[in-house]
Each structure stands twice: as structure tokens, then as C-alpha cells.
């Protein structure tokens, strides 16, 4: 039980815990999502019922885990957390489900990585709050039904297309998280700077937000790294736009927030002179296809630097102009 219920957040996320809002009123960005969640949470709380199952999906780093924590806090219930890859056996999931209390939140990160056998166990658990366990083997095998306390499953995924239709359809509240605007990220950075007691000018916060790829997780990481530079090298002890720019360039982050990995990806497609398949890119860059599709491509598609076509990935003229302006090619 200890292993499969351990925190599934990476070290970077753990360092962000102190900056994490605890209530929806403190959550910056995703305004329509927040407003709808307030309705759903208040309705469930008023009826004294478990909230309907929630599916949070979208690119990495937009606040899926944070929202799951907030839902539990707003409902004043326990929060249990695991991840799809950790649930390799039916017994793993059964152990978690049978230890839940009424109205608890069960958060499954990377839910798209559940194997099909585990997924099928979830069907009856989500719909009927029961668990069908096969006891015995062969002709003597029988099904034992175990009742479960009503609970809320919150699933998170960066690749909703990999979820099976039966599982996806069992989530009554699907929520799509989108990239943040520069203004929203500036507020995220300013709030975080106060939490970690770091002085930052408005222009400094905006400079970081412009280069954070529309992603709070990246913005918070860059803020921490720039703070490191400031504490060691800057005598004014305040992050200005000029200082942020210098620090970000030292970190290999260009004016649009692209890093060395992005540039290598774009140059590879540019040098190919033709639409390039994901497997070819993966092999050429020695990068996992999942990392390319989940981490690298979403932002490049958003800013119209690449296009996905049936024949492969195509670099746009806008991207080529940027590569030339920055003297990458």
C-alpha cells in the first residue's frame, strides 16, 4: 500500500508545493474551469454527496494535480494519490479502493497508462461503487462482490486520446486545461515570488512569463533558477527584466521560451526538407516519442511553429524566420 499510494509528483512539483494555492479563489487562470468547479463542488457539498468523477486533461504543468488537491480541500475530504504506471496488478487497485472512506478523492495521475485489466475493474467501481473479485481458479472460480464507499475519482492525463471510450465516458466532469496567457502567468509569478520572499519588479515578472511557454510549472521553475542567480550575483536583490533576460539566456531559454531541446527538434525537421514522421524524429534526437508528443510539440503547435500532417511534421515559415533571426540556422 505504501508504494502505490506514494506521491507521484516529481521533485520539481514537490518544490512547488509551498507555492500551490489551496482554494479555488486563490487559483490563477483557467477562469471558466474554476467557475464551473465552484458550482460542482458546492452542489455536491450541499447535497452531502460525493462529487461526480472528474477527468483533467491538457498539456503538462497547467495545474491538474493542484486542482485535484483543491477539490479535496474544498470538499473537506481525504485525498489519496497514485499513478497509472504504479497500478500493475488488480490487487494494487483493490487495496486502494477498499481503504477509501466515503466521499474521499482518489487521484490517479497518468491515467492513460493504466493497463486494460485494471481499467475494467474501475468500471464497476466508478458506476456502482462495488468491486468484483474472482475467488478461486478454474471451474471452482466464483465472483465475490465487495461494496465500496461512494468516492470521487479524479483522473489526470496529458494524452486523452489514449483513454478508452468506456473509461472516458464514465467521467461526468471532463475538464480541459489550456495554456496560460502572459498576464495570467505574470500574476502566478508575482504570487510565487511573495511566497518564497523574493523581490521582483512587474517588468521582471512579465519577462519570465513571456518565456514560460504558457505553463505555470515552467514559470515557477524559471523563477527559482533566476532567484539563484540573483542571490549570488545581483547586489540590488531584485529581479528586473534586464536581469531576468540575462539569467534566462544563461539557462538557454530564448525570447519565445524555446530551449535547446526545442531548437534541436526544429532544426532536425528543417534539415529533413520534407514532412518528418515522429519515429524518425525520435530516432534522430534519441528522444522518447511520448516526451516529444507531450512536452515538446504542444507549445510549438500553439505558436504555429510546426504542423502535424498525415505525412509527418512540417516546420512553418514562422519557425524558420525565428531560427534565422536567432542565428540557429
Swiss-Prot record:
Q: Where does DNA bind?
A: 308, 313
Q: Which residues does the annotation say bind Mg(2+)? A: 65
CDD domains, per the entry = AAA
Q: Where is this region: Head domain (RuvB-H)?
A: 255-329
Residues where ATP binds = 20, 61, 64-66, 127-129, 170, 180, 217
Coiled-coil annotated spans: none
The record's similarity note reads: Belongs to the RuvB family.
Subunit text: Homohexamer. Forms an RuvA(8)-RuvB(12)-Holliday junction (HJ) complex. HJ DNA is sandwiched between 2 RuvA tetramers; dsDNA enters through RuvA and exits via RuvB. An RuvB hexamer assembles on each DNA strand where it exits the tetramer. Each RuvB hexamer is contacted by two RuvA subunits (via domain III) on 2 adjacent RuvB subunits; this complex drives branch migration. In the full resolvosome a probable DNA-RuvA(4)-RuvB(12)-RuvC(2) complex forms which resolves the HJ.
Q: What is this protein called?
A: Holliday junction branch migration complex subunit RuvB
Amino acid at each position: 500500500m505504501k508504494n502505490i499510494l506514494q506521491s507521484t509528483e516529481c521533485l520539481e512539483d514537490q518544490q512547488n508545493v509551498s507555492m500551490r494555492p489551496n482554494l479555488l479563489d486563490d487559483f490563477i487562470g483557467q477562469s471558466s474551469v474554476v467557475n464551473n468547479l465552484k458550482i460542482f463542488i458546492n452542489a455536491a457539498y450541499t447535497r452531502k454527496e460525493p462529487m461526480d468523477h472528474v477527468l483533467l486533461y491538457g498539456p503538462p504543468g497547467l495545474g491538474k494535480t493542484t486542482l485535484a488537491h483543491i477539490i479535496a480541500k474544498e470538499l473537506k475530504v481525504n485525498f489519496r494519490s497514485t499513478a497509472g504506471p504504479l497500478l500493475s496488478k488488480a490487487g494494487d487497485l483493490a487495496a486502494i479502493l477498499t481503504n477509501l472512506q466515503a466521499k474521499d478523492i482518489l487521484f490517479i495521475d497518468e491515467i492513460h497508462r493504466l493497463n486494460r485489466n485494471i481499467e475494467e475493474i474501475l468500471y464497476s467501481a466508478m458506476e456502482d461503487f462495488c468491486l468484483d473479485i474472482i475467488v478461486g481458479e478454474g471451474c471452482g472460480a466464483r465472483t465475490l462482490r465487495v461494496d465500496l464507499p461512494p468516492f470521487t475519482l479524479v483522473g489526470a492525463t496529458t494524452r486523452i486520446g489514449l483513454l478508452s471510450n468506456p473509461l472516458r465516458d464514465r467521467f461526468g466532469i471532463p475538464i480541459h486545461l489550456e495554456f496560460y496567457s502572459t498576464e495570467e502567468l505574470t500574476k502566478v509569478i508575482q504570487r510565487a515570488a511573495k511566497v518564497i520572499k523574493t523581490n521582483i519588479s512587474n517588468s521582471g515578472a512579465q519577462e519570465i512569463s513571456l518565456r514560460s511557454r504558457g505553463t505555470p510549472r515552467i514559470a515557477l521553475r524559471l523563477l527559482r533558477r533566476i532567484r539563484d542567480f540573483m542571490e549570488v550575483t545581483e547586489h540590488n536583490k531584485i529581479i528586473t527584466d534586464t536581469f531576468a533576460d540575462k539569467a534566462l539566456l544563461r539557462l538557454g531559454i530564448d525570447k519565445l521560451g524555446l530551449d535547446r531541446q526545442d531548437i534541436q527538434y526544429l532544426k532536425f525537421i528543417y534539415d529533413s526538407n520534407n514532412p518528418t514522421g515522429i519515429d524518425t524524429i525520435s530516432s534522430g534526437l534519441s528522444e522518447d516519442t511520448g516526451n516529444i508528443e507531450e512536452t515538446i510539440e504542444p507549445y510549438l503547435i500553439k505558436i504555429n511553429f510546426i504542423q502535424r500532417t498525415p505525412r509527418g511534421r512540417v516546420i512553418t515559415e514562422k519557425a524558420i524566420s525565428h531560427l534565422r533571426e536567432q542565428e540557429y540556422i
